[in-house]
Amino acid sequence: MAREFSLKNTRNIGIMAHIDAGKTTTTERILYYTGRIHKIGETHEGASQMDWMEQEQERGITITSAATTAQWNGHRINIIDTPGHVDFTVEVERSLRVLDGAVTVLDAQSGVEPQTETVWRQATTYGVPRIVFINKMDKTGADFNYSVGTLHDRLQANAHPIQMPIGAEDQFNAIVDLVEMKLYTYTNDLGTDIEVTEVPEEHLADAEAMREQLIEAVADVNEDLMEKYLGGEEISVDELKAAIRQATCDVEFYPVLAGTAFKNKGVQLMLDAAIEYLPSPLDVKPIIGHAADDENEEIIAKPDDSAPFAALAFKVMTDPFVGKLTFFRVYSGTLNSGSYVQNATKGKRERVGRILQMHANSREEISTVYSGDIAAAVGLKDTTTGDTLCDEKNQVILESMEFPEPVIHLSVEPKSKADQDKMTNALVKLQEEDPTFHAHTDPETGQVIIGGMGELHLDILVDRMKREFKVEATVGAPMVSYRETFKKAAAVQGKFSRQSGGRGQYGDVHIEFSPNEVGGGFEFENAIVGGVIPREYIPSVEAGLRDAMENGVLAGYPLIDVKAKLFDGSYHDVDSSEMAFKVAASLALKEAAKKCDPVILEPMMKVEIVMPEEYMGDIMGDVTSRRGRVEGMEARGNAQVVRAFVPLAEMFGYATNLRSNTQGRGTYSMVFDHYEEVPKSIAEDIIKKNKGE
C-alpha cells in the first residue's frame, strides 16, 4: 500500500494544558470537524471520544494519552491527547518525546496555571514548538489580554496573538485573523457556517495596532523580516506566514489564537494554524541514537521511508479486545505487519502481529506504517515504554526517557488468596504501562507497597485493579517517600578484616564524604594513587556505597545528594576480594553517619489554591498550620490565588479539607518541586516510628 500522505503533509501534535482548561473538548471538536466522529461528546456528561477508560469518563479528566489520527486540508494530523492532571506528568513527558509540535490550551479566565507551567517546562526540555489556544472565550470573566499577559509573566514566553477576538463572554462571536486581516464571523451554533469578510471600520485601528506588534515580535527573531520592517517596506502575507512558521519551528516564538471549543468557535482556524505553523517530521532535528553495540557510534534516524526501520515505543496499554497494545512512533523506514523487528534496548527479537491506527477507542487495521507516523502494534511481548524497535540488520538505540521516582507510597493487601494471584498479574501489567508506578514487597513486613506521583495517581491505579483486573484489595494510609542526606563533610575509614582459618577477608578504605548540590545525586570520585587499592576493587567500593545508601543511615530512607572521594586504603594479596571492599565501603558509610550530620529530607509540593476572597484568611492560616510557606498571592478575576510550598506529608486529604473550608468553592493543584530538610522534632518522630519505638 502506497503512502497516503507525504511526510511534508504529516503533523504529530499533542494537546496539553492544565486540568479543566478544555483540552479533551478541544480534541473532540478537532475530531468532529475532521470528520472522525459524527456526534459531539461532552466531557462533563462523560461521553467524550478521547476519554475511553471508564474512570476517565466518570471523573471527566484524561488519564492516558490516546493517539488519534485525523485528516484536515490534505494533511494527516496524529493527535496525542495528554492528561492535564499533575499526577500524570509522566504521560505528558512520554507523549512530548514523540511529538513534533503541540497546542497548549489555556482557560481564558485563568491564563497560565501551575500545571501549564509544568507541561510548558517539559515541552521546552524536549524542544517542542507550540501554538497557544486560549479557550473558553465564552466563559464569564474571560479575558484574552490577561491570558496573553500570563504567558509573558509566568513563562517568559515570546508569545503574541495572531488573532484578535471580537467580544468576550456571551458576546464572543467573531475572530480577526491578524496575518491575513480578515474577519471570521460564526453564524450557527455548530461552528460549521463561517462568514469571511474584510475587517470592519470599528475594529480596524485595534487590529492594525495588534498586527504591528505581531510583526515586531516576529522580526525580533527573524533578520530578513527585521530588515524589511526597519526599512519601512511592505511585508506580504506569505512573507509574514513564512517568518512565523520559521520562528515557531525554531521554538523562538509562540503564535496565540482564541476560541471556545465548547461553543464550536475558533477550532478550524486553530487546525489551520497547526498545519501552517507547526513542523512536519522533516522540519524537526533528526533524532540521534547510538549503535546497539557501541555507545560512542552515533546513528541518525532520518525521516525517510527507504532508510532502515527505527521506532520508539512510547506507551503500553492493555486492551480488553486485543491484549497488549504498544504505541510507537516511526522515526525512519517502514514497518509491515507480520514482520520481525529487534528490540535493541532489551536485545530481543519481536514479531509484530497486527498494526493498528488508533482513533480514541476504535481502531483500523493497516498493513504498513511509514516514517513519521504513529501507530499501535499487537503481539510485542517484551517491549516496554522507552524501548527502541529497529531493523535486525541495522541496530540502533534511540535516546530513551527519564522517569521521576515516586513521591508517595501505599500498602495494598489482597482480600483473599484468589485476589493475591490476580493482584500480582495486575501489578506487573500496570507497571509495564506506567514507569512511574512502582510496586515491591517490603522484606520486613511482607506487605505489597505501591508508589506513584500523587494521591490521585494511586487512587486511579487501585481503582483500575478493581475494575479491569477484578482485584479486591484493602488500601493502607499513604506514606511519604522521605530521603536522607549529609550536611557536613568528613573523612572516615571503613575496615573489614576477618580471619577464621583458611582464606580471610580484608578490605580497607578511606573515604571523604561531602554534601552535593540539591538534585546532584551521588557522585563517586576515585582519587587513589600508587595502587594502594588495586583498580579491580574500585567498582566494588562504589557498588558497596550505592547499596548501603539505599537503606540510609538514620531511618532507612535512601541517602541522596552526597559526594564520596576514595583517597586511600590498603589491601591484602590473598585475603582481599570484591566482597570485602563492598563491606568496607558500607562500614565507612556507617562511620560517616556519626560525623557528617545526617538529616531527613521531605518532598515539598508547589501548591496553588484558588478561592473567593472571603476565605483568604482561613486558607492562609490553614497553609501555615501545615508548615507551608506562602510564596505569593494575586487576584485572578474575582478570585484570589495563593501560591505556597507545603510538605507532602501535610497535604494528605487536603481536597476534603479545602472543600469544607470554602463551601466547595475552592480548588487547588500541586506538583512535586524539591526536597527540603525536615524540622528536628518531626525528624525525631520519623526515626522513632521507623525503629518501632
Curated annotation (Swiss-Prot):
Pfam families xrefs:
EFG_C, EFG_III, EFG_IV, GTP_EFTU, GTP_EFTU_D2
Could you tell me the keywords of this UniProt record?
Cytoplasm, Elongation factor, GTP-binding, Nucleotide-binding, Protein biosynthesis
Q: Does the keyword Protein biosynthesis apply?
A: yes
- One GO BP: ribosome disassembly
> What coarse category fits the chief subcellular location reported for this protein?
cytoplasm
- Name one molecular function that GO assigns to this entry: GTPase activity
Q: Which GO terms describe its cellular component?
A: cytoplasm
**Where in or outside the cell?**
Cytoplasm
Ranges for domain tr-type G come to: 8-282
Q: Where do the annotations place GTP binding?
A: 17-24, 81-85, 135-138
Q: What does this protein do?
A: Catalyzes the GTP-dependent ribosomal translocation step during translation elongation. During this step, the ribosome changes from the pre-translocational (PRE) to the post-translocational (POST) state as the newly formed A-site-bound peptidyl-tRNA and P-site-bound deacylated tRNA move to the P and E sites, respectively. Catalyzes the coordinated movement of the two tRNA molecules, the mRNA and conformational changes in the ribosome.
Q: Which family does it belong to?
A: Belongs to the TRAFAC class translation factor GTPase superfamily. Classic translation factor GTPase family. EF-G/EF-2 subfamily.
HAMAP family associated with the record: EF_G_EF_2_B
Q: What is this protein called?
A: Elongation factor G
What is the species of this protein?
Macrococcus caseolyticus (strain JCSC5402)
